[in-house]
């Protein structure tokens, strides 16, 4: 039997603390070489603004096997009343290959993306960080706020986006209530950056939206949005001045304009990347080494994140009797 799990089921079963813990283990396993994760297969349809990806992974130690199909269609909300990001995840039995669960992957994508930033923040941000800033207030920003609050002892979170002030205020009010942390609107991206100890960028920008002169010493940056070649959120000088940690170096070189563009400009080399988050977790390389350096976690999103979280959701669903059983063989 296959367990069918909808968005509400996933939301009830996958908390941010659990997601961060399972992702820490997944990144460590990838670094240790006990996970298989082929390059994602991507299809782009510019005629409809569509980005389609198929992302398989097998974490041998964790026993998680599966694949995610995810799409990003920018016109969905306005034209069809659908989310921009739509995903579905298959979880398979590692011994038989049988699909044991099919679940909504849209919400899970937001949670796991935030959780990765949370794990990176745990390892790379200054321990005395008290103010975080999030640039972007779309659906994917929700998980980022939750993860930052979980990862650091924050007194305040600043938010800024190009959306209207009422939408930003609604976002701030909602998450102030959920987290118990003061969430306020910044007047500009620059004012947010200058005040924050931790900054997460989660936008669909095509050109840099921050300037290297804005960062104060010791800032930790999570560069999460604009994860495609040729587009970026960060200017070249920011990448040059930061200690760069990737979710996976080769994936960032292949897909992240934030890294790819400086390399193509001839002012940054792949060897300048400090390493992968899993290597920091496993103690193979140093993370933050002093309170003055600027650290940058660049993430394009990996299948190990989806499949490890989905496997956890499936196990918890079985324990709690959540979901609908369905027999595909009838």
What would you call each of these model-derived segments?
Residues 150-178:
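NAD(P)-binding Rossmann-fold cofactor-contacting core
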Residues 180-267:
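Rossmann-like adenosine-cofactor binding region
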Residues 7-9, 231-330:
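Adenosine-phosphate binding glycine-rich loop
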Residues 131, 155-156, 182:
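Residues at the starts of beta-strands that form the adenosine-phosphate
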Residues 1-110, 118, 128, 275, ...:
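N-terminal ligand-binding/catalytic initiation module
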Residues 117, 125-151, 160-164:
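Glycine-rich adenosine-cofactor-binding loop
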Residues 95-105, 158, 183, 289-294:
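Glycine/charged-rich beta-loop-alpha catalytic/anionic-binding loops adjacent to active sites
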Residues 116-117, 139-146, 174, 181-187, ...:
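Active-site glycine-rich loop that binds ribose-phosphate moieties when present
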């Amino acid at each position: 039997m296959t367990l069918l799990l909808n968005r509400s089921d996933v939301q009830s079963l996958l908390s941010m603390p659990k997601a961060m813990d399972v992702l820490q283990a997944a990144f460590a396993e990838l670094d240790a070489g006990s996970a298989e994760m082929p390059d994602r297969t991507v299809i782009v349809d510019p005629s409809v603004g569509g980005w389609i990806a198929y992302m398989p992974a097998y974490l041998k130690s964790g026993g998680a096997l599966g694949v995610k199909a995810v799409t990003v269609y920018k016109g969905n909300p306005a034209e069809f009343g659908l989310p921009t990001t739509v995903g579905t995840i298959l979880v398979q039995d590692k011994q038989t290959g049988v699909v044991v669960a099919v679940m909504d992957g849209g919400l899970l994508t937001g949670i796991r993306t935030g959780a990765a930033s949370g794990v990176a923040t745990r390892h790379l941000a200054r321990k005395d960080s008290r103010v975080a800033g999030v640039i972007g207030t779309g659906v994917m920003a929700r998980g980022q706020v939750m993860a930052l609050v979980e990862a650091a002892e924050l007194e305040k979170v600043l938010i800024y986006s190009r959306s209207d002030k009422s939408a930003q205020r609604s976002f701030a009010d909602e998450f102030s209530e959920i987290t118990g942390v003061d969430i306020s609107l910044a007047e500009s991206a620059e004012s947010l950056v200058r005040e924050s100890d931790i900054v997460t960028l989660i936008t669909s920008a095509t050109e840099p939206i921050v300037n290297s002169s804005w960062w104060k010493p010791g800032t930790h940056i999570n560069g999460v949005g604009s994860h495609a070649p040729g587009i970026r959120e960060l200017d070249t000088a920011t990448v040059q001045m930061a200690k760069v940690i990737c979710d996976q170096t080769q994936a960032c070189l292949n897909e992240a304009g934030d890294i790819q563009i400086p390399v193509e400009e001839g002012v940054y080399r792949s060897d300048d990347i400090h390493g992968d988050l899993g290597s920091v977790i496993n103690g193979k390389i140093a993370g933050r080494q002093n309170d003055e350096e600027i650290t940058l976690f660049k993430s394009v999103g990996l299948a190990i994140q989806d499949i490890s979280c989905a496997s956890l959701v499936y196990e918890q669903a079985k324990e709690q009797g959540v979901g609908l059983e369905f027999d595909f063989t009838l």
